[in-house]
Amino acid sequence: DIKSIPEDFYEINYNNDSWDEIDVPSNWQIKGYGIPQYTNLIYPWTGREDIKPPFAPVKINEAGCYVKYIDITKEQLNKKVLINFQGVESCFYLYVNGEIVGFSKDSFSPSEFDITDYLVEGKNKIGVKVYRWCDASWLEDQDFWRLSGIFRDVYLEIKNKTHIVDFR
């Protein structure tokens, strides 16, 4: 439930020790948080909340928070550090050490963020707030199970500050 999420869960001094753990990648519903929902022709919120595009459900929207601590060395701080999310349904905010880094929506496309400027030597806190529905959920309504969470791999890439990138 969005209303029950602590506003400051991503802050450095917020204590997350009492939180449940969940595997990443996985879906909340498969792990017992919420109910899996199959949808074919009807939007999952039809009859439960009266909304029109481009707005996302609010009353029935769910959210989940993830926290991960990583250690960064002095040598790594002298490089470019990227974090990659290969799949998150349906949208999310990324925080590093209490600062918002960015936002992404598109469940099935990868998202990459440069977190270099947010890191410190030693322990770093990464926070991710994932929402079950967003305005892009109107476009993702297909014949499939609607599940939420970080359902594909997440990884760090550490590169030299000057490097070659392939693009098309």
Predicted regions and their residues:
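Accessory beta-strand-rich segments of carbohydrate-active enzymes
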Residues: 1, 5, 27, 35, ...
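Surface-exposed, low-complexity/disordered Ser/Thr/Gly/Pro/Asn-rich loops and linkers
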Residues: 31, 35-58
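Predominantly extracellular/luminal regions of secreted and cell-surface proteins
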Residues: 1-2, 8-37
